Amino acid sequence: MSRFLICSFALVLLYPAGIDMYLVGLPRIAADLNASEAQLHIAFSVYLAGMAAAMLFAGKMADRSGRKPVAIPGSALFIIASVFCSLAETSTLFLAGRFLQGLGAGCCYVVAFAILRDTLDDRRRAKVLSLLNGITCIIPVLAPVLGHLIMLKFPWQSLFWAMAMMGIAVLMLSLFILKETRPASPAASDKPRENSESLLNRFFLSRVVITTLSVSVILTFVNTSPVLLMEIMGFERGEYATIMALTAGVSMTFSFSTPFALGIFKPRTLMITSQVLFLAAGITLAVSPSHAVSLFGITLICAGFSVGFGVAMSQALGPFSLRAGVASSTLGIAQVCGSSLWIWLAAVVGIGAWNMLIGILIACSIVSLLLIMFVAPGRPVAAHEEIHHHA
């Protein structure tokens, strides 16, 4: 079992590493490519667009051909794209490389969640996804630090060579450690069960909405945090970095505590707790009389996301034993596109950073609480399948 957990964690971590590691080198990248930093900030959106594009086909391929046939080319593409970015001499080529990086990371991301659905029952999957969420929270803190250390001795291109090395490690794991987990193709008599795993299932759709809103909350916070903390609250850049490191610490603490909480409380209880924390955070930020209270509200955001997201993802994947790849893709596309759409629309309409965050917190909590209380799971399905090792 440990091989599947190690491979799944490695496959997922390409996604945040591709976002965070290069940011520290952005000024030098812009100077060398004769582009402004503002022009290159679109590289974040281009990367997410690549991920979303990969998710359109990766899930279906993983269900038809297997997990390894998607993980291997996905990690290989991430390696090639990282090298391409390091060799880029214009901003256009650099952005093209970032899109390809997103394609590779998206393939690996989808496969990771499909593997966990294949190999773990509901309760263990919820615990593992909570742990995975905690590990993912470490990357935004460690990646810029690692990038800074690399750039003390080497040019910015070395950041992408470091990403390529990460991709090589994932490729080696996919080739030599990961074993195929896709359930054997169903017999004709099992076709009705395959067809019953509909993406239009009310319970699945409710969890898609909940996880998409939750991701929108956390990405809104990440995107607005420089404005909130430095421009509105007046913190210096060093203080901002310290606060963000502390919020990552809060996220990790609650993520690593959630598996123990699942041994005591029902998953539904933790999901309700998560949304209550979001609601409390929104109210706290709305009425905050001081910076200290506002910072407390921010910690509630991190705690709420960490307590509930892994549980909600596990519940979303639960009904799908034969279509776990497609379900994972659907979740990923909804989360990436939904959160990006909200942030874009709020910016176009002219909603300020503070109100943008408060609005999504309150909307997420109210909608999610209603869905948790009134949309119950359908008929029980097999928690997980026996692993068939394909030649």
From Swiss-Prot:
Residues annotated as signal peptide:
none
**Where, by residue number, does the polypeptide cross the bilayer?**
4-24, 38-58, 76-96, 99-119, 131-151, 158-178, 203-222, 245-265, 269-289, 293-313, 331-351, 356-376
Protein origin, superkingdom = Bacteria
Query: Which Gene Ontology terms of cellular component type are present?
Result: plasma membrane
PROSITE patterns listed in its UniProt record: MFS
SUPFAM superfamilies reported in the protein's UniProt record: MFS general substrate transporter
Record's protein name: Multidrug resistance protein MdtL
The answer to keyword Transmembrane helix applying to this record is: yes
Q: Which GO terms describe its molecular function?
A: transmembrane transporter activity
Cell compartment(s), UniProt: Cell inner membrane
Topological domains on the Cytoplasmic side lie at 1-3, 59-75, 120-130, 179-202, 266-268, 314-330, 377-391
Please give the family membership noted in the entry: Belongs to the major facilitator superfamily. DHA1 family. MdtL (TC 2.A.1.2.22) subfamily.
Disulfide-bonded cysteines: none
NCBIfam families of this UniProt entry?
PRK10473.1 (NF007782)
Q: Which residues lie on this side of the membrane: Periplasmic?
A: 25-37, 97-98, 152-157, 223-244, 290-292, 352-355
Q: State the annotated membrane topology for this chain.
A: Multi-pass membrane protein
Q: Which UniProt keywords apply?
A: Cell inner membrane, Cell membrane, Membrane, Transmembrane, Transmembrane helix, Transport
Q: What is its main location?
A: membrane
The answer to whether the entry has keyword Membrane is yes
> By its UniProt entry, which Gene3D superfamilies does this protein fall under?
Multidrug resistance protein D
Organism of this sequence? Shigella flexneri serotype 5b (strain 8401)
Q: Which InterPro entries does the protein's record reference?
A: MFS, MFS_dom, MFS_Efflux_Transporters, MFS_trans_sf, Multidrug-R_MdtL
